[in-house]
Regions:
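Transmembrane signal-anchor helices characteristic of membrane glycosylation enzymes that use polyprenol
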Residues: 1-22, 120-122, 211-229
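Start-transfer (signal-anchor) and selected internal transmembrane alpha helices
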Residues: 1-10, 73-76, 102-114, 205-213
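Short acidic/glycine- and proline-prone juxtamembrane loop motifs at membrane-interface regions
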Residues: 22, 125-138
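Short hydrophobic/aromatic helix or loop-helix immediately within or flanking a transmembrane segment
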Residues: 31-61, 65-69, 76, 172
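Transmembrane-helix motifs of polytopic, lipid-linked glycan transferases
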Residues: 65-102, 117, 142-152
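Membrane-interface transmembrane helices that cradle and orient dolichyl/undecaprenyl
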Residues: 107, 143-162, 171, 190-196
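Membrane-interface alpha helices of multi-pass inner-membrane proteins
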Residues: 117, 161-175
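Transmembrane-lumen/periplasm boundary regions of multi-pass, lipid-linked membrane glycan transferases
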Residues: 136, 180, 189-256
Length: 256
């Protein structure tokens, strides 16, 4: 939390003063300046829903401030995740590190998390999205939380960590097409982390149902469009988001 507080102060001090080119689409949707209904990033829509109550002049600053909070929380999760990394991958590590769960126990064990936070937090793209309300930093925050949950499960074997990871990953997919590409890796990570316990205790059913529930976020913006009388049908709004995600993924793999 010390790192998160320091990062928040830094990002607030260097906050974008107004609307950037990258944040224009998100800010215009929140401010109601778009003629078309919002069809993408349903999770960002939920987080920014209270900001619609603000006057238009305060909206850009509020969006940028929210991005700074997301950026600071992402670094806090990064610090925790690095601290949880096991140090028993090689024979030499197993000989030197005798602590429980093979966590780094030397006097300078605070340096790797701090170094990771500095490298990530001061990286130009990360800094830009943490000081401008583009909405991209929310995607990274969710990704960081999923990794943290998988690492926490290794310590206490509580199934709730795997359930949290599944829920957050599932709600990330409608908001970010990139998470679809990570889905096979996430499945492998769940199997590797949970091992046979997933099948002995019926945990896989809980993960399946919570994942499906998270994916229902795809339906949020189509419902909003219909309820607000935007003139667009439920199917049109839904297929616009799904079509864009399919297009991004197709272009990604076709260019390799």
């Amino acid at each position: 939390w010390v790192v998160a507080a320091g990062a928040l102060v830094l990002y607030l001090a260097t906050l974008h003063s107004w609307i950037s080119f990258a944040s224009l689409p998100a800010v215009s949707h929140v401010g109601g300046c778009q003629d078309l209904p919002q069809t993408k990033q349903p999770l960002l829509y939920l987080f920014t829903l209270p900001l619609k109550l603000l006057p238009a002049s305060a909206l850009p600053f509020a969006m940028n401030g929210l991005a700074a909070v997301f950026g600071a929380l992402t670094l806090a999760l990064l610090v925790r995740s690095v601290a949880l990394l096991p140090h028993d991958r090689t024979k030499e590590q197993r000989q030197r590190e005798q602590s429980e769960h093979s966590l780094l126990s030397i006097g300078l064990n605070w340096m790797p998390p701090l170094f990771a936070a500095l490298i990530c937090g001061l990286q130009l793209s990360f800094w830009q999205h943490s000081t401008s309300g583009t909405g991209e930093i929310l995607n990274l925050l969710l990704f960081a939380y999923v990794i943290r949950c998988l690492l926490e499960y290794r310590l206490d074997d509580k199934p709730s960590w795997l359930i949290r990871a599944t829920v957050v990953f599932a709600i990330s997919i409608p908001n970010n097409w990139g998470m679809i590409g990570f889905l096979p890796l996430f499945g492998v990570a769940l199997l590797w982390t949970g091992r046979m316990r997933l099948f002995r205790e019926g945990l896989w059913l809980k993960l399946l149902f919570t994942g499906i529930a998270g994916l229902s976020l795809y339906l949020l913006l189509p419902l909003v469009a219909v309820m607000t009388g935007s003139g667009y049908s439920f199917t049109e709004v839904l297929t616009d988001n799904l079509g864009d995600q399919k297009s991004f993924l197709s272009n990604l793999f076709s260019n390799r």
